[in-house]
């Protein structure tokens, strides 16, 4: 019987060895538990057109599963809205919550592979923090992820990505994400 060693994700290892110490020195924390870290990453794909054509949600589910390596949860409408021809319970989106090693591997692929592949990418906006150190940004198509075959895309779909951290304010969250390698625009 062979023993296999589980490799630590590259970004997680960098966080533990370098980034935590740098943040501790920058913010002068009294306790190591105060150092901000990443809790989870939520990837959401809203498919409003699925209200008219139910088959469109399957493409979003397949794309999200390929990108994240996890089966998405189908999000359904909470209430009916006549103007949008929407009934309660209709599928209108898909969502994946990533934690642990999958989260670190996704962030690594996002920062090092996907974001640099965006055409005319000038950096992420540093103003999209929510006040408690969490960061949300949107991508307008799924083709920048190398898991998606460009020829098999039935239609471009955007997605929202939320990075939830243990930071208590935006300055700590921004420092953590910048240290992890998020390319923020310089104002």
UniProtKB/Swiss-Prot annotation:
Family designation: Belongs to the universal ribosomal protein uL5 family.
BP GO annotations: translation
SS bond list: none
Keyword rRNA-binding attached: yes
GO CC annotation: ribonucleoprotein complex; ribosome
Subunit structure as annotated in this protein's UniProt entry: Part of the 50S ribosomal subunit; part of the 5S rRNA/L5/L18/L25 subcomplex. Contacts the 5S rRNA and the P site tRNA. Forms a bridge to the 30S subunit in the 70S ribosome.
Name assigned to this protein: Large ribosomal subunit protein uL5
UniProt cross-references to Gene3D superfamilies, sorted A to Z: 3.30.1440.10
Alphabetic keyword roster: Ribonucleoprotein, Ribosomal protein, RNA-binding, rRNA-binding, tRNA-binding
Presence of the UniProt keyword rRNA-binding in the record: yes
């Amino acid at each position: 019987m062979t023993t296999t060693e589980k490799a630590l994700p590259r970004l997680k290892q960098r966080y533990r060895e370098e980034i935590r110490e740098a943040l501790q020195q920058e913010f002068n924390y009294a306790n190591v538990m105060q150092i901000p870290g990443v809790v989870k990453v939520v990837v959401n794909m809203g498919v409003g057109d699925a209200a008219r054509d139910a088959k469109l949600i399957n493409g979003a589910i397949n794309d999200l599963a390929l990108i994240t390596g996890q089966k998405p949860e189908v999000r359904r409408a909470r209430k009916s809205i006549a103007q949008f021809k929407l009934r309660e319970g209709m599928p209108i989106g898909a969502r994946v919550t990533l934690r642990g090693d999958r989260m670190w591997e996704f962030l690594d692929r996002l920062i090092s592979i996907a974001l640099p592949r965006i055409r005319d990418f000038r950096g992420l906006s540093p103003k999209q923090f929510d006040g408690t150190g969490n960061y949300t940004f949107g991508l307008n198509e799924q083709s920048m992820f190398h898991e998606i075959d460009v020829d098999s895309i039935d239609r471009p779909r955007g997605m929202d990505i939320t990075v939830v951290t243990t930071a208590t304010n935006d300055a700590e969250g921004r420092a953590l994400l910048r240290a992890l390698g998020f390319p923020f625009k310089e104002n």
